[in-house]
Amino acid sequence: MGGTFDPIHNGHLVAASEVADLFDLDEVVFVPTGEPWQKHHRRVSAAEDRYLMTVIATASNPRFSVSRVDIDRGGPTYTKDTLRDLRDLNTDADLYFITGADALGSILSWQNWEDMFSMAKFVGVSRPGYELDGKHILDAMRELPPDALSLVEVPALAISSSDCRKRAEEQRPIWYLVPDGVVQYVAKRGLYTRKPNNGEAKDGDVKDEEAVR
Protein backbone atom coordinates (compact mmCIF):
# COMPACT_ATOMS: atom_id res chain seq x y z
CA MET A 1 0.00 0.00 0.00
CA GLY A 2 1.64 3.19 -1.14
CA GLY A 3 1.05 6.64 0.28
CA THR A 4 2.51 9.65 1.99
CA PHE A 5 0.98 8.61 5.34
CA ASP A 6 1.24 12.13 6.71
CA PRO A 7 -0.17 11.02 9.04
CA ILE A 8 -1.35 7.46 8.56
CA HIS A 9 -4.95 7.25 9.80
CA ASN A 10 -7.57 4.63 10.59
CA GLY A 11 -9.01 4.87 7.09
CA HIS A 12 -5.72 3.57 5.67
CA LEU A 13 -5.77 0.66 8.09
CA VAL A 14 -9.39 -0.27 7.40
CA ALA A 15 -8.76 -0.05 3.65
CA ALA A 16 -5.72 -2.32 3.89
CA SER A 17 -7.62 -4.84 5.98
CA GLU A 18 -10.59 -4.79 3.60
CA VAL A 19 -8.44 -5.29 0.49
CA ALA A 20 -6.47 -8.07 2.19
CA ASP A 21 -9.73 -9.87 2.91
CA LEU A 22 -11.31 -9.32 -0.51
CA PHE A 23 -8.23 -10.45 -2.44
CA ASP A 24 -7.05 -13.05 0.08
CA LEU A 25 -3.66 -11.39 0.50
CA ASP A 26 -1.06 -12.98 2.75
CA GLU A 27 0.48 -9.65 3.69
CA VAL A 28 -0.05 -5.93 3.21
CA VAL A 29 3.20 -3.98 2.94
CA PHE A 30 2.87 -0.25 3.68
CA VAL A 31 5.36 1.79 1.65
CA PRO A 32 5.71 5.42 2.79
CA THR A 33 6.71 7.75 -0.03
CA GLY A 34 10.31 8.88 0.00
CA GLU A 35 10.67 12.03 -2.11
CA PRO A 36 7.57 12.66 -4.27
CA TRP A 37 7.65 14.25 -7.68
CA GLN A 38 4.14 15.59 -8.40
CA LYS A 39 2.21 18.66 -7.22
CA HIS A 40 4.78 20.26 -5.00
CA HIS A 41 2.14 22.30 -3.25
CA ARG A 42 2.74 21.71 0.45
CA ARG A 43 5.32 20.71 3.01
CA VAL A 44 5.41 17.10 4.10
CA SER A 45 6.78 15.74 7.36
CA ALA A 46 10.23 14.17 7.30
CA ALA A 47 10.27 10.68 5.79
CA GLU A 48 11.57 9.18 9.03
CA ASP A 49 8.63 10.61 10.98
CA ARG A 50 6.15 9.25 8.47
CA TYR A 51 7.88 5.86 8.49
CA LEU A 52 7.82 5.63 12.29
CA MET A 53 4.15 6.65 12.47
CA THR A 54 3.36 3.89 9.98
CA VAL A 55 5.31 1.33 12.02
CA ILE A 56 3.45 2.38 15.17
CA ALA A 57 0.07 2.23 13.45
CA THR A 58 0.56 -1.23 11.93
CA ALA A 59 2.45 -2.98 14.74
CA SER A 60 -0.55 -4.79 16.23
CA ASN A 61 -1.63 -6.49 12.99
CA PRO A 62 0.53 -9.51 12.06
CA ARG A 63 -0.68 -9.22 8.48
CA PHE A 64 0.81 -5.74 8.10
CA SER A 65 4.44 -4.74 7.59
CA VAL A 66 6.25 -1.55 6.58
CA SER A 67 8.91 -1.20 3.88
CA ARG A 68 11.60 1.47 3.59
CA VAL A 69 12.31 0.85 -0.11
CA ASP A 70 11.12 4.29 -1.24
CA ILE A 71 12.73 6.14 1.66
CA ASP A 72 16.09 4.39 1.40
CA ARG A 73 16.32 4.54 -2.39
CA GLY A 74 16.81 8.29 -2.47
CA GLY A 75 15.73 10.67 -5.20
CA PRO A 76 12.16 11.15 -6.44
CA THR A 77 9.71 8.33 -5.69
CA TYR A 78 8.16 6.71 -8.74
CA THR A 79 5.71 3.83 -8.47
CA LYS A 80 7.57 1.88 -11.15
CA ASP A 81 10.64 1.83 -8.91
CA THR A 82 8.57 0.83 -5.89
CA LEU A 83 7.08 -2.12 -7.76
CA ARG A 84 10.43 -3.16 -9.19
CA ASP A 85 12.05 -3.20 -5.76
CA LEU A 86 9.17 -5.08 -4.14
CA ARG A 87 9.14 -7.62 -6.94
CA ASP A 88 12.89 -8.17 -6.54
CA LEU A 89 12.35 -8.80 -2.83
CA ASN A 90 9.35 -11.09 -3.40
CA THR A 91 10.08 -12.92 -6.63
CA ASP A 92 7.35 -15.55 -6.20
CA ALA A 93 4.60 -13.22 -4.98
CA ASP A 94 1.62 -11.83 -6.89
CA LEU A 95 1.75 -8.10 -6.19
CA TYR A 96 -1.27 -5.86 -5.68
CA PHE A 97 -0.58 -2.13 -5.48
CA ILE A 98 -3.11 -0.41 -3.22
CA THR A 99 -3.52 3.35 -3.46
CA GLY A 100 -6.20 6.01 -3.28
CA ALA A 101 -8.63 5.85 -6.18
CA ASP A 102 -8.39 9.62 -6.60
CA ALA A 103 -4.65 9.22 -7.22
CA LEU A 104 -5.44 6.95 -10.14
CA GLY A 105 -7.08 9.92 -11.84
CA SER A 106 -3.61 11.06 -12.87
CA ILE A 107 -2.21 7.62 -13.63
CA LEU A 108 -1.51 8.41 -17.28
CA SER A 109 1.04 10.99 -16.11
CA TRP A 110 2.94 8.46 -14.02
CA GLN A 111 6.36 7.51 -15.33
CA ASN A 112 6.17 4.33 -17.47
CA TRP A 113 2.60 3.73 -16.35
CA GLU A 114 1.94 1.05 -18.98
CA ASP A 115 4.79 -1.11 -17.67
CA MET A 116 3.51 -1.00 -14.11
CA PHE A 117 0.52 -3.17 -14.93
CA SER A 118 2.85 -5.98 -15.93
CA MET A 119 4.37 -5.88 -12.43
CA ALA A 120 1.24 -5.69 -10.28
CA LYS A 121 -2.52 -5.49 -10.20
CA PHE A 122 -3.82 -2.14 -9.01
CA VAL A 123 -6.48 -1.63 -6.35
CA GLY A 124 -7.91 1.86 -5.88
CA VAL A 125 -9.62 2.42 -2.53
CA SER A 126 -12.27 5.12 -2.38
CA ARG A 127 -15.12 6.61 -0.48
CA PRO A 128 -18.55 5.15 -1.34
CA GLY A 129 -19.95 6.55 -4.58
CA TYR A 130 -16.60 7.48 -6.11
CA GLU A 131 -16.28 6.95 -9.86
CA LEU A 132 -13.07 7.04 -11.87
CA ASP A 133 -13.56 10.03 -14.17
CA GLY A 134 -11.91 10.94 -17.42
CA LYS A 135 -12.66 9.41 -20.80
CA HIS A 136 -8.96 9.24 -21.66
CA ILE A 137 -8.30 7.20 -18.52
CA LEU A 138 -11.22 4.86 -19.07
CA ASP A 139 -10.21 4.34 -22.69
CA ALA A 140 -6.67 3.46 -21.62
CA MET A 141 -7.95 1.03 -18.99
CA ARG A 142 -9.95 -0.87 -21.62
CA GLU A 143 -6.67 -1.92 -23.23
CA LEU A 144 -5.66 -3.72 -20.03
CA PRO A 145 -6.81 -7.12 -18.70
CA PRO A 146 -10.13 -6.97 -16.81
CA ASP A 147 -8.48 -7.65 -13.45
CA ALA A 148 -5.67 -5.11 -13.92
CA LEU A 149 -7.51 -2.44 -11.92
CA SER A 150 -10.16 -2.79 -9.22
CA LEU A 151 -11.98 -0.15 -7.19
CA VAL A 152 -12.93 -0.92 -3.59
CA GLU A 153 -15.26 1.29 -1.56
CA VAL A 154 -14.20 1.84 2.05
CA PRO A 155 -16.55 3.98 4.21
CA ALA A 156 -13.74 4.78 6.67
CA LEU A 157 -11.95 6.74 3.93
CA ALA A 158 -14.13 9.68 4.86
CA ILE A 159 -11.14 10.29 7.16
CA SER A 160 -8.35 12.17 5.39
CA SER A 161 -4.74 12.94 6.24
CA SER A 162 -5.27 16.58 5.26
CA ASP A 163 -8.09 16.93 7.79
CA CYS A 164 -5.97 15.27 10.49
CA ARG A 165 -3.14 17.71 9.77
CA LYS A 166 -5.50 20.68 9.89
CA ARG A 167 -7.02 19.55 13.18
CA ALA A 168 -3.57 19.06 14.72
CA GLU A 169 -2.46 22.50 13.53
CA GLU A 170 -5.57 24.02 15.10
CA GLN A 171 -4.90 22.04 18.31
CA ARG A 172 -8.11 20.08 17.86
CA PRO A 173 -8.23 16.36 18.80
CA ILE A 174 -7.28 13.65 16.32
CA TRP A 175 -8.11 10.81 18.71
CA TYR A 176 -9.98 7.94 16.99
CA LEU A 177 -9.08 9.34 13.57
CA VAL A 178 -5.55 7.98 13.82
CA PRO A 179 -4.21 5.15 16.02
CA ASP A 180 -3.50 6.10 19.64
CA GLY A 181 0.26 5.68 19.24
CA VAL A 182 0.25 8.05 16.27
CA VAL A 183 -1.66 10.67 18.28
CA GLN A 184 1.08 10.52 20.90
CA TYR A 185 3.88 10.58 18.30
CA VAL A 186 2.40 13.66 16.60
CA ALA A 187 2.17 15.45 19.95
CA LYS A 188 5.68 14.47 21.05
CA ARG A 189 7.27 15.57 17.77
CA GLY A 190 5.13 18.66 17.41
CA LEU A 191 4.15 17.64 13.88
CA TYR A 192 1.73 19.80 11.88
CA THR A 193 2.35 22.80 14.10
CA ARG A 194 3.91 25.99 12.81
CA LYS A 195 6.98 25.36 14.98
CA PRO A 196 7.92 21.66 15.15
CA ASN A 197 9.50 20.49 18.41
CA ASN A 198 12.49 19.07 16.56
CA GLY A 199 14.27 21.11 13.92
CA GLU A 200 15.52 17.98 12.15
CA ALA A 201 12.00 17.09 11.07
CA LYS A 202 11.59 20.53 9.55
CA ASP A 203 14.91 20.26 7.74
CA GLY A 204 13.75 16.95 6.32
CA ASP A 205 10.52 18.40 4.98
CA VAL A 206 9.78 17.89 1.32
CA LYS A 207 6.76 18.81 -0.70
CA ASP A 208 4.30 16.08 -1.58
CA GLU A 209 0.75 14.95 -2.24
CA GLU A 210 -1.29 12.30 -0.50
CA ALA A 211 -0.53 9.26 -2.63
CA VAL A 212 2.50 7.69 -4.21
CA ARG A 213 2.95 8.07 -7.96
Curated annotation (Swiss-Prot):
Keywords for this protein: ATP-binding, NAD, Nucleotide-binding, Nucleotidyltransferase, Pyridine nucleotide biosynthesis, Transferase
Residue ranges, compositional bias (Basic and acidic residues): 200-213
Gene Ontology MF term list: ATP binding; nicotinate-nucleotide adenylyltransferase activity
UniProt-listed Enzyme Commission number(s): 2.7.7.18
Pathway: Cofactor biosynthesis; NAD(+) biosynthesis; deamido-NAD(+) from nicotinate D-ribonucleotide: step 1/1
Record keyword Metal-binding present: no
Purpose: Catalyzes the reversible adenylation of nicotinate mononucleotide (NaMN) to nicotinic acid adenine dinucleotide (NaAD).
Family recorded in the similarity comment: Belongs to the NadD family.
Full protein name: Probable nicotinate-nucleotide adenylyltransferase
Organism encoding this protein: Mycolicibacterium smegmatis (strain ATCC 700084 / mc(2)155) (Mycobacterium smegmatis)
Gene that this polypeptide is encoded by: nadD
